Amino acid sequence: MQRYRTLAGALGWGQMLISIMTHIPSNRSLIAVAGFCWIASTAPVASQDQLFLTLATGGVTGVYHPAGTAICRAVNKSRSEHGVRCAAEAGSGSVGSLKQLRDRDVDFAIVQADWQHHAYLGTSVFAEFGPMADLKVVAGLHTEMAAIVARADSGFMDLSDLKGQRINIGPAGSGSAATWGQLSQHLPWSEEDRAAITQEDLSGLGEALCSGEIDAYFVVIGHPAGVIEETQEVCPVQFIEIGAGISEKMVADAPYYRAAEIPSGTYGEHNAIETIGTRALLITVEQMPAHAVSTVLRSLLSDIERFRTVHPALTDLDGAQLVEAKTEAPLHLGAVQFYEDQGYLP
């Protein structure tokens, strides 16, 4: 979990000393060794205690990656003061990031609340792994909403018209693909009706839709979404609503979903688009030092004005919203301490 990356830590003092003595002529070895020992004895202690963190995000065309990059940028601005450094990694999405966190391949992750729920309880696609009981929440970010996008001339009116059509639901491991799996449980479709569904990433979706390679695509994302705006630059689009009937069933089945609306005008639409929504969360594991968690939160809040400009979905984010992350998984101790100090928790 703690990635200490110093030259001495990588090689070991003894190995470095042997390397020096091996590669320096013998008549200068004593001077070299003496000089090396002086450098080692006077090296700043802080350089040996740097904590390197990795943050799993998502595809570069969504909200998660720019948000994660901005969080790490905020942390790194003051790294000489708190001794923490951060790097954001692009990935396949929520499910993939949760598996990385479970395997300790990353230290933090930005994921959808629904898949954090399943990972914590060991249900759905995480059933084979069992509960991830050490999963902890750090902060709530923006609201993610599902969108089903089709060409304006498709003639589709509602979800029933998509039966048997070529729908891209996002790559395996993405929150979008997993959420489609939940939604499709409420659709009376046969295996044959689902046979044409594809799982490609977001890049090139606009071209694929407008050229007729696919008939529609499904994404769960913060809005306005770049992938949808890019599609509109290629051809006119329409949105297929997830009606109240299915929304109510999904909310009844799972508390992490809620009925939602993409506001009118977001994509030039005259009316709001009925859909479902869930929260994007910043998460970690219990073993992460409280100092690291509080440092990430303090850095984010201190740079919140810049953070809001990263994506329109983050425009209204503030400290009070960060703590609004109601899930089965509890807040990390470092987050609790930070929010209490800031007055966001009683």
Q: Which positions does each model-derived feature cover?
A:
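Bacterial N-terminal signal peptides that target proteins for export
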Residues: 3-7, 18-31
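An extracytoplasmic/periplasmic, membrane-proximal ligand-sensing/linker region
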Residues: 204, 210-211, 221-239, 291-346
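Pocket-lining segment of extracytoplasmic ligand-binding domains
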Residues: 113-115, 123-128, 154, 191-283, ...
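Bilobed "Venus flytrap"/periplasmic-binding protein-like clamshell domains
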Residues: 52-78, 144-211, 305, 325, ...
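N-terminal hydrophobic or amphipathic helices and topogenic motifs
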Residues: 38, 44-87, 133, 305-346
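Ligand-binding clefts/hinges and TM-proximal coupling segments of bilobed small-molecule sensing domains
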Residues: 165-182, 255-324
